[in-house]
Amino acid sequence: GPYRPFYHSLKPRWYLDRYGTYDDGSISHVLAEDHYLSGTNLFIRRSLLEQLGGFNTAVGMTGTRLGYGEETSLQRRVRQERPNEMIYYEPRLTVSHLVRPEKMRLLWCAKQMFVSGRDWQRVVYDTTTERIHAILSCLRAVRALLELVKGFLLGYLRRDRIRYPYIENYLYEVVFVHLQTLGSTYEQVTHRAKH
């Protein structure tokens, strides 16, 4: 189901509630094959979790290490190993989610975008070792770097100040998405180097 933010500390003026929100609509539905529930609001039968061997501990948060994907990895295994099971979104199961102060810092947001791209590549896509895929990934990374630099420059000089009243909004919503591409490419290249 959905989750909505709450705060124990003063949030920065630029930080919008929607940055800490997940909502897939007001109608209950079975998720499409390429959609996944967020781990922030995920329920699973214990017996099914045990049958699948639990969560993949190679991905996700570990101690102080930032990571994502353990819930996505689990949902992918449910679909592969138990195809008759349904993954269901129920909007009435709402969670209030504490947004910790560090998650409202711009540097943390940048790192989170990179890591989410890296881990999405790790969990959802086959991290291929074929040379052509590595080359294409590197080309996407170069483009993402150029977009990142362009976004920083344009953000300061020419951003839509109505839509992005603070430079942080522009960076978070427009520029930092390119960090996901860089994270994905990083995972592909490092995976290739290891194999």
Regions found by a protein language model. Name each.
Residues 59-67, 96-118, 122:
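Nucleotide-sugar-dependent glycosyltransferase catalytic core
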Residues 108-118, 127-195:
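Non-catalytic, C-terminal membrane-associated alpha-helical segments of glycosyltransferases
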Residues 14-19, 105-107:
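Short, hinge-like loop/turn segments at secondary-structure boundaries
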Residues 41-52, 59-93:
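A short, conserved alpha-helix in the catalytic core of glycosyltransferases
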Residues 1-2, 16-35:
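Short, flexible, basic/aromatic active-site loop/helix in glycosyltransferases
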Residues 5-6, 50-51, 97:
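Active-site micro-motifs of SAM-dependent methyltransferase domains
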Residues 37-38, 113:
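An anion-binding catalytic pocket shared by soluble metabolic enzymes
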Residues 1-13:
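Conserved donor NDP-sugar-binding/catalytic core segment of glycosyltransferases
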